[in-house]
Amino acid sequence: MKKTIFLLILLFTTVLADEIDFNFDGWDRECYLYKPSCIPDNPGEDFEPVPLVLMFHGLGGEGEDNYDFTSLAEDSCFMVAFPSGMYNTWNLGPEAPGGHDIDDISYIEALVDTIYNYYPLDTNKIYATGHSAGGGFTNHLACATTKFTALGSAAAYLWTAFEHWGEGLDSDLAEEYNYLCDPMTIGYTMPMIHFHGRMDWGVFVEWGEMSAVQGALR
């Protein structure tokens, strides 16, 4: 199916923070965008392009929940986008909690392209990060798109490892399903970093063994 995208930008070039409303593939999508003050309203050809970071919220959240991240963007001169997932989550795969089948990957690719059309972005410095379900979606990006330079997640899994959830969390299954995110299969590698707390009672660190095997391949 051909993907279409329509964009309404509110005060896009005159203020530091904007809400962007997309209609992508028939769905109304929302994203908050932060432009640091180091970027002038009309940057000339000599202006050095800046990095872009996408930050993904967890299950039950929305983009504006992560807006405190803007102080770091202001200090270090990079742009930040805070997309909102449909139904307050992301498409992490058929067995992921609270998931759906909306094409979030294509939406995020279109979002990056659209921001690039309006702002001086360094396409070699496009990053993504997320927490919990947002971290799971960040991990999923490593297997599904080449838009990003590097990825970082916290309190999350690579949910493709759990697409056969009903068969149990046996580490032997990890090797069988490594093809879901194997650089030899998808043709590229992706720098990644992940953080997880041992006292996390929502996303158990012990369940990450299968995910870790695949993550090591990235």
Residue ranges and their predicted role:
Residues 12-13, 67, 210:
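Alpha-helical transmembrane segments and their juxtamembrane interfaces
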Residues 11, 87, 133, 158-159, ...:
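Residue-level marker for beta-strand->alpha-helix junctions and adjacent short loops that shape enzyme
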Residues 150, 155-218:
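The feature captures the conserved acid-bearing segment of alpha/beta-hydrolase catalytic domains
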Residues 22-38, 44-127, 131, 136-140, ...:
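Serine-hydrolase catalytic machinery in alpha/beta-hydrolase-like enzymes
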Residues 15-17:
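Boundary at the C-terminal end of the N-terminal hydrophobic targeting segment
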Residues 3-13:
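Sec-dependent N-terminal signal peptides
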Residues 6, 20-22, 43, 69, ...:
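Residues embedded in well-ordered secondary-structure elements
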